[in-house]
């Protein structure tokens, strides 16, 4: 097929690579404009742009698709289909109507659950045991289009947003190739609005741990916010991130939430609203990530210390 591909991050780059490998003719690659990145804040190309250039594919980086110029550029491609994966720009109806077979989206959840910007993190936060990929026809609403195919991906107890992202990227790449090869046989299914839920965008403040919450919920938060924006709390008024943690076994002593119960090389144990959380990897402000043992080797932290203030 003649394909316009629209995407930006590594999740999307995996799908682009799979489409190229499957022999589809990628007539144009849309991706976000280069952005400042790194300590030097130099302009950096998106993962999709890098993949496209490596294959000699034409790249187009508009700031909007609402202009006549942008829409004319897409129309000139005479594409059979547009494949969209974490692109980051709104597709107006005029663009959705351009490809002969419409626009297909690779969404990282089992729709209609977790429509929206952060489906991977929301699935972990909610304690879901599985998530997946939905290939859907794009419509004007937020992830409301008819579903063409689904792939289930289990969520392991140790999965972070990063590891689950990688598993979903592989699944999404395979799913879109399969969907295009079987397109004529796929039957669109309308989403059940009664089962819809929304994966709101993450914020740094949301990633601040509330020690009043149960330990199991806080352990999920640490996994969900790893690597970005990173679960965090305060120690002596200074923020530090918690990168790996687990709910403690039963039997830890009772204490006000946020109180350090024990601090040794095996971990920093903190009382929660229910149970206790064991911190295994942390990152203090201005420092690199380190194990609890390494952190304690350079700083005294005694039982009774309060976190969060």
Swiss-Prot record:
PROSITE patterns: GART
Gene Ontology MF term list: methionyl-tRNA formyltransferase activity
One GO cellular component term noted in the UniProt record for this chain: cytosol
Lineage of producing organism: Bacteria, Pseudomonadati, Pseudomonadota, Betaproteobacteria, Nitrosomonadales
Source superkingdom: Bacteria
Function: Attaches a formyl group to the free amino group of methionyl-tRNA(fMet). The formyl group appears to play a dual role in the initiator identity of N-formylmethionyl-tRNA by promoting its recognition by IF2 and preventing the misappropriation of this tRNA by the elongation apparatus.
UniProt binding sites for (6S)-5,6,7,8-tetrahydrofolate: 109-112
Enzyme class: transferase
Alphabetical keyword list: Protein biosynthesis, Transferase
Recorded coiled-coil stretches: none
Organism: Thiobacillus denitrificans (strain ATCC 25259 / T1)
Name the UniProt record assigns to this protein: Methionyl-tRNA formyltransferase
């Amino acid at each position: 097929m003649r394909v316009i591909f629209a995407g930006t991050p590594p999740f999307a780059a995996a799908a682009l690579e799979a489409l190229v490998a499957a022999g589809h003719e990628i007539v144009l690659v849309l991706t976000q404009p280069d952005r400042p990145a790194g300590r030097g804040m130099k302009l950096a190309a998106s993962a999709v742009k890098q993949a496209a250039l490596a294959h000699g594919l034409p790249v187009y980086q508009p700031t909007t698709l609402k202009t006549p110029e942008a829409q004319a550029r897409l129309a000139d491609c005479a594409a059979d289909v547009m494949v969209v994966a974490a692109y980051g720009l709104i597709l107006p109806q005029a663009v959705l109507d351009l490809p002969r077979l419409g626009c297909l989206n690779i969404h990282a959840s089992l729709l209609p659950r977790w429509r929206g910007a952060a489906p991977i993190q929301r699935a972990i936060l909610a304690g879901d045991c599985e998530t997946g990929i939905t290939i859907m026809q794009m419509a004007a609403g937020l992830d409301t289009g008819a579903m063409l195919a689904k792939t289930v991906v289990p969520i392991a107890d140790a999965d972070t947003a990063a590891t689950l992202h990688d598993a979903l990227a592989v699944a999404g790449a395979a799913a879109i190739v399969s969907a295009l090869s079987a397109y004529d046989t796929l039957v669109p299914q309308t989403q059940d609005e009664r089962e819809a839920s929304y994966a709101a965008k993450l914020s740094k403040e949301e990633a601040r741990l509330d020690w009043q919450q149960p330990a199991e919920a806080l352990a999920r938060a640490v996994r969900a916010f790893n690597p970005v924006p990173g679960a965090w709390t305060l120690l002596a008024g200074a923020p530090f991130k918690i990168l790996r943690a687990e709910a403690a076994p039963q039997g830890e002593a009772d204490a006000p939430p946020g109180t350090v119960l024990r601090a040794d090389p095996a971990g920093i144990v903190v009382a929660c609203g229910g149970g206790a959380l064991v911190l295994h990897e942390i990152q203090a402000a201005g420092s690199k990530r380190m194990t609890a043992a390494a952190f304690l080797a350079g700083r005294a932290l005694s039982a009774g210390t309060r976190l969060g203030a």
